[in-house]
């Protein structure tokens, strides 16, 4: 609706809030990089735990993005979680599908932009539904991916 039927362009990104929220919610539930590794460069304390220098630390976006302290009904797809009002009080690293800090994925902004435009173009033309008998299961590898793909039906709008 924000586009009036025309193909989306870069200048439309600020008006594609719902496409952005949908992509962020998909990345919350199934972050492609499900595990990140960091090494402590010096001794530190994290959450009351002593961490010696050179300790490997695993960060698990897949688990953090489902943690009930941060996400109510975490297994449900609810794009509105990422509205401005619902995001403003969320802890900084409750959501980090692209990592964070100085080692955040360089492609973060490009991926967000590309996804918003693609989602908008698809939804302009089709109503998308998950195939009724298809169950999405994650396959853990270097990245998280759908085990048997994602079967959808497309209905022209």
Where are these regions (language model features)?
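Active-site-adjacent bridging/hinge elements
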Residues: 85-95
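Conserved, non-catalytic sequence blocks in retroelement Pol enzymes and Pol-derived host proteins
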Residues: 9-17, 103-107, 140-144
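Conserved cytochrome P450 K-helix/beta-meander segment immediately N-terminal to the heme-binding cysteine loop
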Residues: 13, 59-87
């Amino acid at each position: 609706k924000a586009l009036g039927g025309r193909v989306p362009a870069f200048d439309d990104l600020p008006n594609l809030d719902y496409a952005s929220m949908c992509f962020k919610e998909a990345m919350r539930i199934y972050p492609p990089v499900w595990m990140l590794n960091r090494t402590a460069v010096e001794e530190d304390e994290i959450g009351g735990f002593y961490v010696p220098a050179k300790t490997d630390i695993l960060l698990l976006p897949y688990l953090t993005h489902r943690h009930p302290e941060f996400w109510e009904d975490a297994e449900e797809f609810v794009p509105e979680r990422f509205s401005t009002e619902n995001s403003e009080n969320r802890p900084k690293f409750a959501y980090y599908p692209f990592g964070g800090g100085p080692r955040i994925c360089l492609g973060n902004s490009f991926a967000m932009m590309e996804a918003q435009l693609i989602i908008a173009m698809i939804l302009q033309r089709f109503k998308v539904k998950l195939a009724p008998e298809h169950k999405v299961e994650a396959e853990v590898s270097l990245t998280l991916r759908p085990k048997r793909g994602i079967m959808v039906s497309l209905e022209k709008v």
